[in-house]
Amino acid sequence: FFPERLLLADLIPVIDIHTWLPTRLFPDFDPNAVENGSFFEYIKNTYCCTIAESSRSTISVTAASPDMAKTLRLSSGDPVLILDSYMETPDGSPLYISREYIAGSRYTISF
């Protein structure tokens, strides 16, 4: 499955998420079930999946392409954070892969 989600804050797009889910783990995945809720809670509760500590994410920055700018309601060339995540189960099997395009002017990351 390749679900896409657009997360809004006060009806303004903040994050455009593209996810790959293996169908063998999520045979009846319902994108509507996560429309207004947590993706992680849904897969944990519905499929009893656990994310391994070895999972990893990287953050990079790019300039918004015309298509990305349209989706996130930005100007072309505005800064966009890219969060790439590779999540796996404790036994090392791929759980999901995602790429999130985050409007740089509308989001803060804290560590």
Which functions belong to the PLM regions below?
Residues 1-111:
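C-terminal all-alpha effector/ligand-binding and dimerization domain
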